[in-house]
UniProtKB/Swiss-Prot annotation:
Entries under InterPro entries matching the protein: SOD-like_Cu/Zn_dom_sf, SOD_Cu/Zn_/chaperone, SOD_Cu/Zn_BS, SOD_Cu_Zn_dom
Binding locations of Cu cation: H116, H118, H144, H195
Regulation: Inhibited by the copper chelator diethyl dithiocarbamate.
Top-level taxon of origin: Bacteria
Protein's name in the database: Superoxide dismutase [Cu-Zn]
Lipid anchor positions (S-diacylglycerol cysteine): C33
Pfam families hit by this protein: Sod_Cu (PF00080)
Enzyme class of the recorded protein, top EC level: oxidoreductase
Coiled coil residues, start to end: none
Cofactor binding notes: Binds 1 copper ion per subunit.
Organism: Mycobacterium tuberculosis (strain ATCC 25618 / H37Rv)
Signal peptide: 1-32
Subcellular location: Cell membrane
C-alpha cells in the first residue's frame, strides 16, 4: 500500500521557497531605490567617507603657523628671581603674534596689568634707569620701546593689557605690526615687562581733565608710562 504524502515536508519546502522569493524581491527593490554611489575622496562627491588621512590644509578649523614664521621667547621673573610668566613672539605675514602665559597661580594680583616692551634688554632688580635717577626694580630696562623714527603715543612697544584671573593666573594672545624681530634684537636688545597696575594708554580727555598746572590732558609721566605703576616682572626678549 503506498505511503500517504508527508504534508509537513511539503509545507516546509513551500515556506522556504516563498521566503527566498520575498527576500530576493526585497533586495531588488532596495537596489532599485538606491543610487549606484561609490566611496570617493574627490571633493563634492557623495557619499563622503573618512579615509583616515589628515584633513586637507585649510580645513582643520584653525590657523597653522606659517612655514616661514620666526620666533623669539622670553622668561619673565619677579625681582627675587621667581618665574612669573613666559612670552613668545611669532613673526609671519608682516606682523607679530605675542603670547603671554603665567607659569603658576598667585604670582600676580587679579585685574589688569600694563604690558610693554621696554627699550633695553636688561632686567636688573633695584637698578637705575639709563637716564639716571633713584633706583627701582627693572628700571635698567629703560622706558617704553620706540622703533627708530617713531615718537608719540602709543609707543611701538605698547601691548594690550594682561587680565589676571582671581587665582592669579593669566594668558594673553595679541598681535601687532609696530615692530619686527630685527627691531627687538638690535642695539641693546629689548625687554618685556608686566606692571603692577592697569595702563590707561594716556587716555585722559583734555575736555574733562586738566593737570595741576591747568594744562588740559595727560602730563608727560602719563604719556610715557600709562600710569601702570611699578614693574613686577621682566624678561629679556630672545633670552629664552
Amino acid at each position: 500500500m503506498p505511503k500517504p504524502a508527508d504534508h509537513r515536508n511539503h509545507a516546509a519546502v513551500s515556506t522556504s521557497v516563498l521566503s527566498a522569493l520575498f527576500l530576493g524581491a526585497g533586495a531588488a527593490l532596495l537596489s532599485a531605490c538606491s543610487s549606484p554611489q561609490h566611496a570617493s575622496t574627490v571633493p563634492g562627491t557623495t557619499p563622503s567617507i573618512w579615509t583616515g588621512s589628515p584633513a586637507p590644509s585649510g580645513l582643520s578649523g584653525h590657523d597653522e603657523e606659517s612655514p616661514g614664521a620666526q620666533s623669539l621667547t622670553s622668561t619673565l621673573t619677579a625681582p627675587d628671581g621667581t618665574k612669573v610668566a613666559t612670552a613668545k613672539f611669532e613673526f609671519a605675514n608682516g606682523y607679530a603674534t605675542v603670547t603671554i602665559a603665567t607659569t603658576g597661580v598667585g604670582k600676580l594680583t587679579p585685574g589688569f596689568h600694563g604690558l610693554h616692551i621696554h627699550q633695553v634688554g636688561k632686567c636688573e632688580p633695584n637698578s637705575v634707569a639709563p637716564t639716571g635717577g633713584a633706583p627701582g626694580n627693572f628700571l635698567s630696562a629703560g622706558g617704553h620701546y620706540h622703533v627708530p623714527g617713531h615718537t608719540g603715543t602709543p609707543a611701538s612697544g605698547d601691548l594690550a593689557s594682561l587680565q589676571v584671573r582671581g587665582d592669579g593666573s593669566a594668558m594673553l594672545v595679541t598681535t601687532t605690526d609696530a615692530f619686527t624681530m630685527d627691531d627687538l634684537l638690535s642695539g641693546a636688545k629689548t625687554a618685556i615687562i608686566i606692571h603692577a597696575g592697569a595702563d590707561n594708554f594716556a587716555n585722559i580727555p583734555p575736555e574733562r581733565y586738566v593737570q595741576v598746572n591747568g594744562t588740559p590732558g595727560p602730563d608727560e609721566t602719563t604719556l610715557t608710562t600709562g600710569d601702570a605703576g611699578k614693574r613686577v616682572a621682566c624678561g629679556v626678549i630672545g633670552s629664552g
